[in-house]
Amino acid sequence: MAAAGAGPGPGVSAGPGPGAAASATTAEDRETEPVAAGAGEGPSAAPGAEPSSGEAESGDANLVDVSGLETESSNGKDTLEGTGDTSEVMDTQAGSVDEENGRQLGEVELQCGICTKWFTADTFGIDTSSCLPFMTNYSFHCNVCHHSGNTYFLRKQANLKEMCLSALANLTWQSRTQDEHPKTMFSKDKDIIPFIDKYWECMTTRQRPGKMTWPNNIVKTMSKERDVFLVKEHPDPGSKDPEEDYPKFGLLDQDLSNIGPAYDNQKQSSAVSASGNLNGGIAAGSSGKGRGAKRKQQDGGTTGTTKKARSDPLFSAQRLPPHGYPLEHPFNKDGYRYILAEPDPHAPDPEKLELDCWAGKPIPGDLYRACLYERVLLALHDRAPQLKISDDRLTVVGEKGYSMVRASHGVRKGAWYFEITVDEMPPDTAARLGWSQPLGNLQAPLGYDKFSYSWRSKKGTKFHQSIGKHYSSGYGQGDVLGFYINLPEDTETAKSLPDTYKDKALIKFKSYLYFEEKDFVDKAEKSLKQTPHSEIIFYKNGVNQGVAYRDIFEGVYFPAISLYKSCTVSINFGPSFKYPPKDLTYHPMSDMGWGAVVEHTLADVLYHVETEVDGRRSPPWEP
């Protein structure tokens, strides 16, 4: 392998990626301190070299001239005076091109700027001692696409946005492969800054600054680039997380295969538009959860279109984190419940908001709908704030007295099943697990009121309306518990569609809109009626413990967990279970993900038809 110019740039000890030890760069690459990229800046501001047959570098006619290559600096775009050690140009002979379409995430991969195929660096024998997985600051052409028939690799200077993106991608990948419960959010001081400091020379050709001002700059960069990074500035109220762990940052798009370099040629641009490639950022509209996620994507969208969409007062909804719910949100408490809202694409005449008669008036709820995530997870808002939910929303840790969390989706008819594994149950801790209706008290144990039914770890007692009865032996750490419910399909609840919430008030919290619903607990309790032929059954390590309850109260039931002190449990909504029941037929709770989307969409459409919203010519408060 022959290297062009003065030789390779910043060197590190042998070994690719995070295993390499950093060393100092050359004097030609020194800068006083890095500056955060401006709004909208990213890898696209550092264009890749486009070699041509007419370009040549002194000493080798087959190597490209990189003396005019542009790169990011604190003063914007500057032209390098020479190749020096500020970049690496490698031109190597390779026997064949990797034709595999599969990715090797976690390895140093390179994307060809012409054919857009991905290759591992080992395919061409490229020295990766100064490289990291998920890097974006390079230009690469495979030996088939390059005019010389050799492989072209140029390592460029990275701006802070690219460095933060690479750091978070590597931290996310490490957590996925090493942690039992992978994280998606990482502490600025404990995770991100130490990672960048350790691998600075692997992440950029820029000289490590003498002044320690770059940590503040990376925080500003990630806080500003909300189309790429998630930001959580403070722990949830009542959380045990120490305040010094915050702010925390994560990637908005958790698909790490979307991370790649930014090439200027049109072929790469079109490929990025189609695939939603991060290219140092996230393509506008490529992510976003909820029922309208796919519809929001603009095929062949342009920057002008994106800006226009953002200025729209109705459809300027914020993009959601990977798990489908805002990091900072209102909690269901004090007699009020909050349902995340998104623009309803089927609502007629959304332009009416621009009329003068709507100035200063609340946005009508019929223009929005409940925002549903297609996966069943533990609810972030429908829980006691002191409970700690894992990043994947499948594990919960208790805190002090009994408190409860419900799942994001509930069932109104049919037979359903889910599992819970007791991960940790220290002495003097306990759990009550089972099913709850939406009005079940979150600051009380499951089974406290008429709206919930539970199974306690101690002595296996079952609870409903705070009345405990012997049911089975208890359970503890390591046990896998199953929860089955069967609701008849001939009840009024079963035949009804879910609430559209369109008649509820819309409130704004941290840039997101929510429907606000008042709880009428006393009225709901008086209207409860038993449902014949309904039943709840619990399982312990695959063994049926018998029918716990029959003829339960009619309603919509959610999987629910209540914990006493620092007990930790994980929930599995399916479709694969460790101990699937063999004596019953059922649907896994995971099926309710798309099932709820269908039900709510039908309810929304019927609402528009039945209320004749299209014919409304004035606000509802006007005659």
Swiss-Prot record:
GO molecular function terms attached to this record: DNA binding; zinc ion binding
ZnF region ranges: C4-type: 112-145
Disulfide bonds: none
Tissue: Ubiquitously expressed, with abundant expression in the heart, skeletal muscle and kidney. Low expression is seen in spleen, lung and testis.
Phylogenetic classification of the source organism: Eukaryota, Metazoa, Chordata, Craniata, Vertebrata
Biased composition (Polar residues): 84-95, 265-277
Region of interest: DNA-binding: 63-172
Protein name stated in the entry: Set1/Ash2 histone methyltransferase complex subunit ASH2
Gene behind this protein: Ash2l
Pfam families listed in its UniProt record: ASH2L-like_WH, PHD_ash2p_like, SPRY
